[in-house]
Amino acid sequence: MTDLKKTQLFSAFDENENVKHGLPFTAYTSNDFFELEARQLFAKNWTFVGFAHDLADVGDVIPVHVAEQPLFLVRSAENQIRAFHNVCRHRNLKLVDEPQNCKNRITCPYHNWVYNLDGQLCAAPFFGG
């Protein structure tokens, strides 16, 4: 990625990084600016990802993307909403494709690795023996 401080995207800021005026229109259409925001803003701060009522029941799970990262939200057995990377740690396969209720576990479709609703690996069939 180019050094964005040398581009028109940062013309809205003074040398102390204070906003001089509104952002240029390219801030809303530039892939470089989006990548910068994803890395420097969204990935480092609290980010809204959904509504609690969309995860009404224990085991409800919803796939989302934040800062170009695939995640999923799940309501745990303790009635807490948790967020996890949407990949199996075995072969990096996507765990959740669509909103659903997974009951009390999330199972990888590749080798059937099983995670509980707190993200802990519970079973790894055919692994290590």
Whereabouts are the PLM-identified features?
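Short, contiguous pre-domain boundary segments
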Residues: K6-F25
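A short linear-motif detector with a strong N-terminal bias
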Residues: K6-T7, F25-T29, L41-A43, G50-A52, ...
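Generic detector of well-ordered alpha-helical segments enriched in charged/polar residues
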Residues: F10-S11, F34-A38, H111
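Non-cleavable N-terminal signal-anchor transmembrane helices
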Residues: K20-G22, T26-A27, R39, K94
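Glycine/alanine-rich phosphate-binding loops at beta-alpha junctions
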Residues: A27-A67
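Rieske [2Fe-2S] iron-sulfur-binding domain
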Residues: L55-G129
